[in-house]
Amino acid sequence: MDWMNIFLAVETSDSAGSGSLELKWLPVAIVCFLMLCLLVFLLIRRKKQINQKNAGQPLNVIRQIRVGKLHGQGARNYQQDSFGVSDPEMLEGSGLLAVVADGMGGLSDGDKISTTVVETVLDGFSYSQGQGTLEQVLLTLAQWSVREVNFFLGPDRYRSSGSTMAMGMIRDGHFSWVSIGDSRICLYRGGQLIQLNREHDLKQKLALQAINGEIPLQEVYTDKRRDGLISFMGMGTIDQIDMPSTPLTLLPGDQLIIMSDGVYNALEESEICAALDKGVEAAPAELEQAILNKAYPDQDNYTAVILSCET
């Protein structure tokens, strides 16, 4: 036998086997490559979907609202302030609503009227699930509250009792409000306290009379009736309300405070700012201690709800 022929035969056989082995693994390699391409495609598409979802949204989105609460009787015999905050679980879908009502101490049943206002607002918000624009929701709740208070009093008792109402609603990074009376709604931003709503007291009417020359300008500041309310829950037909033309766009770090006059009449603006600067968890105690330190013998009921906007 020719050894050269045997060698060539073996080499030929090995080469044929190697080629067969390579062909066997080729489909597996192709499948793996296609799967890798599919994975890359899915990752790229997912990234595009996330970018499209976030397109047009601000980088600092308000995702959490923390709430602080202050409620004290002061030197009064009764607590006639009422307040409430909606269920935080409703924030993502419906928004968050807060309300403060200050029963009028000079009239009877102020506590019952303020309680009626708060209960109607919160029950109505829960029932409606906050459907509609901010303005529509707030006006509807105000309408229901006026109706319930008037029904409670009856036509013969209009103006015999009353309460203020200040409510605000946050949804999707925006804030709007409706107020009746002299409870205040303020924004604390960048170390400054900005009053958002207008008070409905006799001072406004006196100022109008003064600029029309009907009374001396000095009477705007000296008339003892100047703090009396000219629009309030319980008067029957409401004369005035306050609401913004457009909702306020909120920023991370903003704080909103809704408070009765027992807070802002007792404290200087700088004292309120100093308390809010401590943060929403510490602010209520800081405000209360500042009020107690004044030791006013006629200290009114004091109530505040603080809403802190966070990412």
Task: Identify what each model region corresponds to.
Residues D2-T311:
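PP2C/PPM-type serine/threonine phosphatase catalytic domain
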